[in-house]
UniProtKB/Swiss-Prot annotation:
Its EC number is 1.17.1.8. Gene3D superfamilies: Dihydrodipicolinate Reductase, domain 2, NAD(P)-binding Rossmann-like Domain. InterPro entries: DapB_C (IPR022663), DapB_N (IPR000846), DapB_N_CS (IPR022664), DHDPR_bac (IPR023940), NAD(P)-bd_dom_sf (IPR036291). It catalyses: (S)-2,3,4,5-tetrahydrodipicolinate + NAD(+) + H2O = (2S,4S)-4-hydroxy-2,3,4,5-tetrahydrodipicolinate + NADH + H(+); (S)-2,3,4,5-tetrahydrodipicolinate + NADP(+) + H2O = (2S,4S)-4-hydroxy-2,3,4,5-tetrahydrodipicolinate + NADPH + H(+). It comes from Gluconacetobacter diazotrophicus (strain ATCC 49037 / DSM 5601 / CCUG 37298 / CIP 103539 / LMG 7603 / PAl5). Pathway: Amino-acid biosynthesis; L-lysine biosynthesis via DAP pathway; (S)-tetrahydrodipicolinate from L-aspartate: step 4/4. The keyword NAD applies. Keywords: Amino-acid biosynthesis, Cytoplasm, Diaminopimelate biosynthesis, Lysine biosynthesis, NAD, NADP, Oxidoreductase. (S)-2,3,4,5-tetrahydrodipicolinate binds at residues 145, 154-155. This is 4-hydroxy-tetrahydrodipicolinate reductase. GO terms for cellular component: cytoplasm. The gene is dapB. Pfam families: DapB_C, DapB_N. The active site is at 144 (proton donor/acceptor), 148 (proton donor). Catalyzes the conversion of 4-hydroxy-tetrahydrodipicolinate (HTPA) to tetrahydrodipicolinate.
Length: 256
């Protein structure tokens, strides 16, 4: 499958990740076809709406805001444009819109486009399957910069979902977070979350499995947001020629 000549658009091209994506598209072998921004200038390759950008693109990379997801899903599905979605903090209705779009176009949706995080998530699923909750307590700790607006992070929730999948349980009914006061003993089947915010930490995630006799922990630290842009461009190039459907970074990395 060739990746030459893939026209890539960037939703939110002037944002923190968008600016990195602009650089990575060119160095990664794609063709930058433009982007969207609220401060778009007339007669440029930056547009005020995704409707205007979509016809110029084979793929759109989207790290914007949860509030735009349902609108973007509809626009890209109607335009037949593939979608790399990295927005986190999505509601059930947002996720349903993503799944509906994936019935018409190829979509890669991931909370984190780092290859390292993808591997940590996969290993967490395997570890959870091998280490029973009756004896191994699963806990997830995440740290991010002070500007981050959602908690736990999308990546932490994705790791938690992997733990739940490995143990064959529902994540929503097994989350323990925000512990304070007299909480009583820890539930044996709980998946615990702890959140730290401060400074300019790009991202750090640790998943641990602790018994009475040992602890196994996996930690991933991001030093530069560029890793997310590099991974997202890799996903965009991979999408060329893919059938409609919902994919993740494990698919992009060929891990399944």
């Amino acid at each position: 499958m060739t990746t030459q000549g893939v026209r890539i658009g960037i939703a939110g091209i002037n944002g923190r990740v968008g600016r990195l994506l602009r650089e990575e598209v060119t160095t990664g072998g794609g063709i930058l076809s433009g982007g969207t921004a609220r401060d778009a200038a007339p007669a440029s390759d930056v547009f005020a709406t995704l409707d205007a950008l979509a016809p110029r693109c084979d793929v759109v990379i989207d790290f914007t805001h949860a509030a735009t997801v349902r609108t973007h899903a509809d626009i890209l599905a109607r335009a037949g444009v593939a979608w790399v979605l990295g927005t986190t903090g999505l509601s059930a209705a947002d996720l349903e819109a993503v799944r509906t779009a994936a019935g018409r176009i190829p979509v890669v949706h991931a909370a984190n486009y780092s290859p390292g995080v993808t591997l940590v998530t996969r290993l967490a699923r395997q570890m959870a399957a091998a280490l029973p909750s009756a004896t191994y307590d699963a806990e997830i700790l995440e740290m991010h910069h002070r500007q981050k607006v959602d908690a736990p992070s999308g990546t932490a929730l994705a790791i938690g979902q992997a733990v739940a999948d490995g143990r064959g349980i529902d994540l929503a009914s097994h989350i323990e977070d925000g512990r304070t006061g007299h909480t009583g003993p820890r539930r044996a089947d709980a998946i615990g979350f702890a959140v730290l915010r401060g400074g300019q930490i790009v991202g750090e995630h640790t998943v641990s499995f602790t018994s009475a006799t040992e602890q196994i922990a996996l930690t991933h630290r991001s030093f530069d947001r560029r890793i997310y842009a590099t991974g997202a461009v890799r996903a965009a190039l991979w999408l060329r020629g893919q059938a409609s459907g919902l994919y993740d970074m494990e698919d992009v990395l060929g891990l399944d």
